[in-house]
């Protein structure tokens, strides 16, 4: 996309007709032979085409050619901005090395830290843009992007600045998350408490004051940070009025999900080792469970998240790519829907909610994204499908016809432009 192509993308204003509408993930609320009106970049009306108010019958028309229109998709957990890649570690995994073994050998997160620190902002932007474009082409209109590969103030700032720049350049809603407590940088080896002090008292205050942070995250694991260290990060976030989320219970059960719930976290993510007490705490707090089937698949995990318990307690389940260079180098949210159904046994409506309303809730943005509703910014996707179930059914195929982001039309294979 050229620098001015966002402004040159045509307006979505007018009546979208010859379509079927899925306002949210509930198939009972689907509207066949529907119409949707966009005015000044926002949804002004939606319903059955036969009920279109007279006031809009003379408005410009957009023929959807029988497509289904859904809310724009939301990718609520990504590590999209980083330097380099880690294909060499893939070979190590195939030879039997595990996540912890690679990390302790100096690979993993810290190897990406070296590449990220060594890259300038323009290089990081170009690399991240290439990763973002396939997601845009699949109908993603809102995305979370974490830092966590800088692990010092300068490089964390660089990552977050690139994330903001991606949103401005592509006309997509980007929600930034400060993940300074992702791993120990080499210069703080064996000094985790000192590093957490830097995160809480230097990095977070500076980045929050610069308006670069929407939420705060941490990696609470035996190879990451302890419950006590994570709580210090959460307390610092609260002092700056920032919501929190947590990488929790991926490799073991440290009680991270319960900690997240005590702090009314937006989400707890991964959760392969989550127990019933953690599920109950999340339910009481309204914390979203973000499922990351790409990492589960890539790591060849065998411990499933407790889907039945999450259902039983009414915990909202979101689905995300977890795009990152080490454990989920995937750029397809549609594939994650299929994996969530096939690997985790989610239903199709659960998968649809997982990439729309529940994903938006995991960002604290369910008042802006995840549903087609009057008054909201026009973020939606048109699909060449006979039924919304096909979005979770196909894999390796992108049935998108048109994507509307922030009231602008991005068509067909050029939906990422």
Swiss-Prot record:
Chief place where the protein resides: cytoplasm
GO molecular function annotations of the record: imidazolonepropionase activity; iron ion binding; zinc ion binding
Residues annotated as binding N-formimidoyl-L-glutamate: 149, 324, 326
Catalytic activity: 4-imidazolone-5-propanoate + H2O = N-formimidoyl-L-glutamate
Cofactor: Zn(2+); Fe(3+)
Cellular localisation: Cytoplasm
Any Pfam family: Amidohydro_1
Domain of life: Bacteria
Function according to Swiss-Prot or TrEMBL: Catalyzes the hydrolytic cleavage of the carbon-nitrogen bond in imidazolone-5-propanoate to yield N-formimidoyl-L-glutamate. It is the third step in the universal histidine degradation pathway.
Family membership noted in the UniProt record: Belongs to the metallo-dependent hydrolases superfamily. HutI family.
Protein name (database record): Imidazolonepropionase
Organism: Cupriavidus taiwanensis (strain DSM 17343 / BCRC 17206 / CCUG 44338 / CIP 107171 / LMG 19424 / R1)
Gene designation per UniProt: hutI
């Amino acid at each position: 996309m050229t620098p001015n192509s966002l402004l040159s993308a045509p307006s979505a204003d007018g009546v979208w007709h010859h379509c079927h509408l899925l306002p949210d993930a509930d198939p009972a609320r689907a509207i066949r032979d529907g119409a949707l009106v966009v005015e000044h970049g926002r949804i002004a009306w939606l319903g059955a085409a036969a009920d279109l108010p007279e006031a809009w019958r003379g408005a410009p028309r957009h023929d959807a050619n029988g497509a289904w229109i859904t809310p724009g998709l939301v990718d609520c957990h990504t590590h999209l901005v980083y330097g380099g890649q880690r294909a060499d570690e893939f070979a190590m995994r195939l030879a039997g090395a595990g996540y912890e073994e690679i990390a302790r050998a100096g690979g993993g997160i810290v190897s990406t830290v070296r590449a990220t620190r060594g890259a300038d902002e323009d290089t990081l932007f170009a690399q991240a843009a290439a990763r973002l474009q396939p997601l845009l082409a699949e109908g993603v209109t809102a995305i979370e992007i974490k830092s966590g590969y800088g692990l010092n103030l300068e490089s964390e700032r660089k990552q977050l600045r690139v994330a903001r720049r991606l949103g401005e350049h592509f006309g997509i809603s980007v929600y930034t998350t400060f993940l300074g407590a992702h791993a120990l940088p080499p210069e703080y080896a064996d000094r985790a408490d000192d590093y957490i002090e830097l995160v809480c008292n230097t990095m977070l205050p500076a980045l929050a004051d610069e308006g670069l942070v929407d939420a705060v995250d941490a990696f609470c694991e035996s190879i990451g940070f302890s419950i006590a260290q994570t709580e210090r990060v959460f307390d610092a976030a609260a002092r700056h009025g920032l919501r929190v989320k947590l990488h929790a219970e991926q490799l073991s059960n440290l009680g991270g999900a319960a900690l997240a719930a005590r702090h009314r976290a937006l989400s707890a993510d991964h959760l392969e080792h989550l127990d019933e007490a953690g599920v109950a705490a999340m339910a009481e707090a309204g914390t979203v469970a973000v499922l990351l089937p790409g990492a589960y698949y890539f790591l060849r995990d065998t411990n499933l998240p407790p889907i039945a318990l999450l259902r039983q307690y009414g915990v909202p389940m979101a689905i995300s790519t977890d795009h990152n260079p080490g454990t989920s180098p995937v750029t397809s949210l549609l594939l994650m829907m299929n994996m969530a159904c096939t690997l985790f046994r989610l239903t199709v409506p659960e998968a649809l909610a997982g990439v729309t309303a529940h994903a938006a809730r995991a960002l604290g943005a369910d008042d802006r994204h995840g549903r087609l509703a009057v008054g909201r910014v026009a973020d939606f996707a048109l699909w060449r499908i006979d039924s919304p179930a096909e979005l979770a059914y196909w894999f390796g195929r992108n049935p998108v016809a048109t994507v509307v982001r922030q009231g602008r039309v991005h068509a067909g294979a050029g939906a990422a432009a």
